[in-house]
Every structure is written in structure tokens, then in C-alpha cells.
């Protein structure tokens, strides 16, 4: 394999890996998350509960309000990973993609017109999660 093909392969693994890990975390929040948990309760679990009651509410949120907890967690993880293992671009790429999971989630609740052609194309081709695929998640019990 050439260096470029190795990088492309790593990027694909990073995207699928980060997508899987954020999905596992979201599943964990739905099943085990409690509003009285330290930090996560107020800033993650409560927000998730509100989202399940009114899924479109998140579409009016700014990028920062959607992703700040993910970016704060990613920054902490980056500092720790650099401290213990040194700098690796793969870790940075994973944290960047993972930190934007809520933006991709927001797109599943928007119309094609709100998303624009590029995002709608990515959803239609399965490159990112489609509205239909995400819809089952909002059926009880969640």
C-alpha cells in the first residue's frame, strides 16, 4: 500500500470508529443516563431527555450549543493522550469527527431544504446517517 492509501484507510477507520463510539455513548445515555449524575446529568442527559420529547428543538441550536460538551471532552482527551502517548494526528482526527457528531445528528432532524444539497446527498447515499435510519431511535423505548 502506498502512503496515501494508508492515510485514506486510516481516515475511513477513524470516521467509522468515531461514529460507532458516539453511537455507543448515545445508547448508554438513553439507557443508563440519569439527570442527577454529576456533570453529565445536567449538561448531557437532561439535554438528551429534552431532545427525545421534542426532537426538532435542537435544530434551532447554534453549533456551539450543540457541540461544546463534546469539544470540552475532546480537549481533555487530547491533553491526556499527548501527555501519555505523544501527538498522533489519528487521535486528533478522531476527536474532531467525534466532536461533530451532534451536528450530524442535528441534520437528521432537519428538512432537505434546511440541510442543503450536499448534506442531503450524503444522507441519501448513506455516507452520513439519514433521517429514516435515525427515525427508529425516537420510537419508545429510547
Region roles according to the model:
Residues 1-142:
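Hydrophobic transmembrane helical bundles of multi-pass organellar membrane proteins
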Amino acid at each position: 500500500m502506498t502512503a496515501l492509501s494508508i492515510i485514506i484507510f486510516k481516515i475511513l477507520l477513524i470516521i467509522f470508529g468515531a461514529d460507532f463510539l458516539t453511537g455507543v455513548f448515545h445508547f448508554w445515555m438513553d439507557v443508563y443516563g440519569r439527570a442527577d449524575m454529576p456533570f453529565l446529568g445536567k449538561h448531557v442527559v437532561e439535554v438528551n431527555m429534552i431532545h427525545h420529547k421534542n426532537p426538532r428543538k435542537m435544530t434551532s441550536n447554534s453549533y456551539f450549543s450543540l457541540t461544546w460538551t463534546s469539544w470540552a471532552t475532546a480537549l481533555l482527551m487530547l491533553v491526556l493522550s499527548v501527555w501519555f502517548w505523544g501527538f498522533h494526528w489519528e487521535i486528533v482526527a478522531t476527536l474532531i469527527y467525534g466532536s461533530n457528531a451532534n451536528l450530524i445528528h442535528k441534520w437528521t432532524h432537519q428538512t432537505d431544504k434546511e440541510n442543503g444539497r450536499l448534506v442531503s446527498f450524503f444522507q441519501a447515499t448513506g455516507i452520513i446517517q439519514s433521517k429514516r435510519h435515525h427515525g427508529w431511535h425516537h420510537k419508545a423505548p429510547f
